[in-house]
Regions:
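Repeat-blade elements of multi-bladed beta-propeller folds
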Residues: 30-33, 59-79, 100-124, 137-164, ...
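A short beta-strand motif characteristic of beta-propeller blades
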Residues: 51-56, 91-97, 132-137, 172-178, ...
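Short loop/turn segments that connect beta-strands within beta-propeller blades
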Residues: 86-89, 127-130, 167-171, 208-212, ...
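Sec-dependent N-terminal signal peptides
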Residues: 13-19
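A short helix->beta-strand "capping" segment at the edge of beta-propeller domains
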Residues: 36-60
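Bacterial N-terminal signal peptides that target proteins for export
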Residues: 3-13
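Beta-propeller domains
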Residues: 77-88
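C-terminal segment of classical bacterial N-terminal signal peptides
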Residues: 20-27
Length: 372
């Protein structure tokens, strides 16, 4: 267990240079609560603290986002202070303000060795090692959702309800497409051989990556909620028609095939979390429902559940709206135990491994892991 945390104070010099000074300080020397969650409580759920860290955010600042990209954990404050941490040990890779205050950092994505962010009408490319801005291009229109790209092009959804395809090296527009119903494009996936986008009218459309040619289209009865999740040949998405869908991409030429749809008890507003064997769906006003990935059958529900934190073997770790960790057995479809997470207000959904990442608004971040 890591018994010390890194306390960092940040300064912005007149020239805009960010400087971090780092001091090691033991937990025992600090007043107040030592831990984000008590180790004694975690022991009850067969969990332990792998590391805990404190970000150098101001007293008037609060942490708002926590998410995983590759092998890094990213934390973003309401004043656009962005920290990149090694998610194995909690060490900071970089910490800096990446956009002016008041201009939200949206849709941070990793493509090869570049972080891509959207800020208003700008596409910003950031070095993931230093946090330095490599490029920034004003594309001349408001961007409605996170960017997607492949080796040749950027794919940007505009507020004008068009998907704009720009050449990657110089951001020159090559062509644009729209759906017949003129609905807003809400998410985009870019591969080398095809592009898929979803709309607020419920359309899921695949086109050629380099020309305005449609390959196939699937229409749900309600708008697509959140981004589409691609897992192998399968697409998983939630619709405001209350259904979770699995659509497979099959054959040559490529075509779509509905594998299953699962009707929930509410109008959905978030994308599902997809792991190796289970699809987890948040249902507003109800909780989190687990669905068998292969057949689309319900496994269990956690009333009041908010999101999946992680999965370990046959166990799922779900955080609830009232800040409780609930551990579910996916095989026996029953609750195993729960832990008070009263101090936890921010978390990352981890579908890659069994580590749990939690935080509070003051910038304390902890990594938990199951005890074997």
């Amino acid at each position: 267990m890591k018994m010390a945390r890194m306390l960092k104070c940040r300064f912005v010099l007149p020239a805009g240079l960010l400087v971090l000074c780092i001091v090691q300080k033991s937990f025992a020397a600090q007043g107040g609560s030592q831990w984000l969650v008590s180790p004694k409580l975690l022991k009850h759920a067969n969990l332990k603290i792998s590391w805990e860290n404190k970000l150098p955010i101001k007293k008037t600042e609060r942490l708002e986002q926590l998410f995983i990209l590759g092998n890094r954990l990213y934390a973003i404050s309401n004043q656009n202070y962005t920290a990149s941490l090694n998610r194995e040990n909690g060490n900071m890779i970089f910490g800096r303000v990446v956009a002016p205050d008041g201009l939200p950092v949206e849709g941070l994505k990793l493509y090869d060795d570049v972080l891509i962010s959207i800020a208003g009408t700008k596409v910003i490319e950031i070095d993931p090692q230093s946090g330095d801005q490599r490029k920034a291009a004003d594309v001349g229109f408001s961007i409605a959702c996170p960017a997607a790209r492949n080796s040749s092009y950027f794919y940007l959804s505009g507020a004008d309800k068009r998907l704009h395809i720009l050449r990657a090296e110089d951001k020159v527009q090559i062509f644009e497409v729209a759906v017949e119903n003129e609905s807003m494009i809400t998410s985009v996936i870019a591969e080398e051989t095809f592009v898929i986008f979803a709309t607020e009218a419920g359309n899921v459309v695949s086109i050629m990556p380099n020309m305005p040619r449609r390959l196939w289209q699937f229409d749900a009865a309600g708008g697509i909620a959140g981004p589409i999740v691609k897992d192998g040949i399968s697409l998983f998405f939630a619709s405001k028609d209350t259904n979770v869908y699995r659509v497979d991409i099959v054959g040559l030429p490529l075509r779509k095939q509905l594998a299953w749809k699962f009707q929930t008890a509410g109008v959905l507003d978030k994308a599902p979390r997809v792991t190796q064997a289970v699809v987890y769906q948040y249902v507003p006003g109800k909780g989190v429902t687990a669905i068998d990935k292969g057949g689309g059958k319900p496994l269990w529900s956690v009333p009041g559940g908010a999101d999946l934190l992680a999965e370990a073997k046959d166990k799922a770790y779900v955080i609830t709206k009232d800040r409780t960790l609930v551990v579910m057995d996916n095989i026996k479809a029953k609750k195993l135990y729960s832990v008070n997470f009263a101090e936890v207000s921010i978390y990352a959904a981890n579908i890659v491994d069994s580590k749990i990442y939690i935080a509070d608004e003051r910038g304390r971040i902890a990594c938990l892991q199951p005890v074997e």
